[in-house]
Curated annotation (Swiss-Prot):
<keyword id="KW-0677">Repeat</keyword>
<feature type="binding site">
    <location>
        <position position="55"/>
    </location>
    <ligand>
        <name>Ca(2+) 2</name>
    </ligand>
</feature>
<dbReference type="GO" id="GO:0005509">
    <property type="term" value="F:calcium ion binding"/>
</dbReference>
<feature type="binding site">
    <location>
        <position position="59"/>
    </location>
    <ligand>
        <name>Ca(2+) 2</name>
    </ligand>
</feature>
<keyword id="KW-0106">Calcium</keyword>
<feature type="binding site">
    <location>
        <position position="57"/>
    </location>
    <ligand>
        <name>Ca(2+) 2</name>
    </ligand>
</feature>
<feature type="binding site">
    <location>
        <position position="24"/>
    </location>
    <ligand>
        <name>Ca(2+) 1</name>
    </ligand>
</feature>
<dbReference type="InterPro" id="IPR018247">
    <property type="entry name" value="EF_Hand_1_Ca_BS"/>
</dbReference>
<dbReference type="Pfam" id="PF13499">
    <property type="entry name" value="EF-hand_7"/>
</dbReference>
<feature type="domain" description="EF-hand 1">
    <location>
        <begin position="7"/>
        <end position="42"/>
    </location>
</feature>
<feature type="binding site">
    <location>
        <position position="20"/>
    </location>
    <ligand>
        <name>Ca(2+) 1</name>
    </ligand>
</feature>
<keyword id="KW-0020">Allergen</keyword>
<dbReference type="InterPro" id="IPR011992">
    <property type="entry name" value="EF-hand-dom_pair"/>
</dbReference>
<feature type="binding site">
    <location>
        <position position="22"/>
    </location>
    <ligand>
        <name>Ca(2+) 1</name>
    </ligand>
</feature>
<dbReference type="InterPro" id="IPR002048">
    <property type="entry name" value="EF_hand_dom"/>
</dbReference>
<protein>
    <recommendedName>
        <fullName>Polcalcin Bet v 4</fullName>
    </recommendedName>
</protein>
<feature type="domain" description="EF-hand 2">
    <location>
        <begin position="42"/>
        <end position="77"/>
    </location>
</feature>
């Protein structure tokens, strides 16, 4: 799939970096859980479910590519998250 508007990519990068608390280039379940607490109450099961959905290669982390693919498939959700972060 062709890349989006450069502004969309920059927005995804900005959000990804906010979720990637330790700056290692990937989002762990713990980082995802901490970031999502900002959005409200979230259970460990909800974090596990989201990881399973977004972590398509099953390595236990969300790469920027996986985050991008999820963002493209869920543009409305990502825009809502962008307003908060």
């Amino acid at each position: 799939m062709a890349d989006d508007h450069p502004q969309d990519k920059a927005e995804r990068e900005r959000i990804f970096k906010r979720f990637d608390a330790n700056g290692d280039g990937k989002i762990s379940a713990a980082e995802l859980g901490e970031a999502l607490k900002t959005l409200g109450s979230i259970t460990p099961d909800e974090v596990k479910h989201m990881m399973a959905e977004i972590d398509t290669d099953g390595d236990g982390f969300i790469s920027f590519q996986e985050f991008t693919d999820f963002g493209r498939a869920n543009r409305g959700l990502l825009k809502d998250v962008a307003k908060i972060f």
